[in-house]
């Protein structure tokens, strides 16, 4: 037999009333759920999304084929091949990122000495096949050309944190 207090609590369903009070408190509280995709929350300028390769203002690719991004990538998602130029510097012939492997850690962006590879704010992309998420050098350069204004603005805002 339980004590009189246990009988009283079970008779008046004290636990149930406590639970209902918590539910009632949150039922009438202000809603914080965002109805995506109709509503969108603001993104940080430091958001790490889809990759892009940048160019200098004269149109030349920034990548100097140092392969630091390939070496630092923990997921081994970056593949780079390079060949020497006539002036002795190197040029990338292949720069591929496999987004099915990428964990979007941002190490490639931090390792790049010339800010050639960056991660944009783009997070809405898809692929119907596995190969659609394999980005080649041309696709990455196209992303960089398309979003260069936003990338430059984000890099300027991020400069104080670097």
UniProtKB/Swiss-Prot annotation:
**Signal peptide start-end:** none
Q: Which cofactor does it need?
A: [4Fe-4S] cluster
State what this protein does: NDH-1 shuttles electrons from NADH, via FMN and iron-sulfur (Fe-S) centers, to quinones in the respiratory chain. The immediate electron acceptor for the enzyme in this species is believed to be ubiquinone. Couples the redox reaction to proton translocation (for every two electrons transferred, four hydrogen ions are translocated across the cytoplasmic membrane), and thus conserves the redox energy in a proton gradient.
EC number of the protein = 7.1.1.-
This entry's comment on the bound cofactor is:
Binds 2 [4Fe-4S] clusters per subunit.
Q: Which PANTHER family would you find in this protein's record?
A: NADH DEHYDROGENASE [UBIQUINONE] IRON-SULFUR PROTEIN 8, MITOCHONDRIAL, NADH DEHYDROGENASE UBIQUINONE IRON-SULFUR PROTEIN 8, MITOCHONDRIAL
Organism field:
Dechloromonas aromatica (strain RCB)
The record's Gene Ontology biological-process terms are: aerobic respiration
Annotated protein name in UniProt: NADH-quinone oxidoreductase subunit I
Q: Enumerate the subcellular locations listed in this protein's record, separating them with semicolons.
A: Cell inner membrane
What PROSITE patterns does the record point to? 4FE4S_FER_1, 4FE4S_FER_2
Q: Which reaction does it catalyse?
A: a quinone + NADH + 5 H(+)(in) = a quinol + NAD(+) + 4 H(+)(out)
One GO CC term of this entry? plasma membrane
Report the domain of life of the source organism. Bacteria
- Quote one Gene Ontology molecular function term: quinone binding
């Amino acid at each position: 037999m339980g004590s009189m207090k246990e009988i009283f609590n079970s008779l008046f369903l004290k636990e149930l009333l406590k639970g209902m009070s918590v539910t009632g408190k949150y039922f009438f509280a202000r809603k914080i759920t965002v109805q995506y995709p109709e509503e969108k929350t603001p993104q940080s300028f430091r958001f790490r999304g889809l990759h892009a390769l940048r160019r200098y203002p004269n149109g030349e690719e920034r990548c100097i084929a140092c392969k630091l991004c390939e070496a630092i990538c923990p997921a081994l998602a970056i593949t780079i091949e390079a060949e020497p130029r006539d002036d002795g510097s190197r040029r990338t012939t292949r720069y591929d990122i496999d987004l099915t492997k990428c964990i979007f850690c941002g190490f490639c962006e931090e390792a790049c000495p010339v800010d050639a590879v960056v991660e944009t704010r783009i997070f809405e992309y898809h692929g119907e096949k596995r190969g659609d998420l394999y980005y080649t050098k041309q696709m990455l350069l196209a992303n960089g050309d398309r979003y260069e204004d936003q990338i430059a603005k984000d890099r300027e805002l991020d400069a104080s944190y670097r």
